[in-house]
């Protein structure tokens, strides 16, 4: 498996107690994070860099979603949209950076199709199923459709919604209340653009000595208190992250400086996402850490941060530690999806109509870890929903580390099919309080079993 070779250094860090939380998804290559806060959870939409890169370029066919209530354990919701959802487009590659928003109980996912413009999907749930409500691209009449990428959506305090996008300049429209059309009576058939001056976005000299705007792509627009923020990828290849502020969402914007500088383990592209969640602030971005430097195989990371008193954003450094403090302990006495993971090695996830998302590609020595599990006064039994079309294997249940205290071993037997699910159980030693919990998988050669959920009793 292509991801397995990337874990050696990170796995050693975990064994030595140097807790790694970044990148926050290890089962797939993910990029262009778009976090959305809804109903006590963060839903993060990402692009998906395929394991196999075709023609030495971004190979991206679909969009994935993850969610978390505590910012350390992330639940994989699988592929929530793909290029195939747009039957009017003939593109088989180019599922680039999306963003989602909720309005009036509906969820709108704005998807750029490289070379086919910005499209939109809608669903009744943040994890879908999404469908195409208009049967065509959303944005028309732009100067160059190849530059119509990286949409960011924002609803202002007065209810007016805006969609911004673009490389190498920022365009925007005023969305109508339905979120799937826009006001064409303003601008050029509805399309407007920001002033791309050095005052607005900073500047640097190009190869001809001409000072040009720093802005490159990946805009992220939001409001905090009375100030509007536009965070973006800047200064070409390799990119760093910068930001500008304004007192009106339509500008004028004022350049404020860097948020994240270039670094050796960052990919040659970057893409920001910024949220406040449960009274804390988080900055999302991507690196090529998981792929050992392959720029077309990126991985999402996140850093906690605090605004300065004047509202400015401090300079942030990418770290392996990421979010070190959980916002809430995990309750193991209710069903926990196996694809809720803080860290893992060697695993993949798949999705079926019978069970939804489950953990797959489980081989001997692979593991997953869940952070801050609250055992309360202790548990006596471990139960798991599993399926195996071979001789199966076992799940070692360990406390605090890969080689931590062994609470018990759940034997997984043959269930007569990889999608034939059974509940299998094991007695465990009593543990009290809050601990990280490791599931270490053991068995023979090849795939051992699939893992859908677990709970304690």
Role assignments for model-derived ranges:
Residues 20-457:
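Carbohydrate-active catalytic/glycan-binding domains of CAZyme proteins
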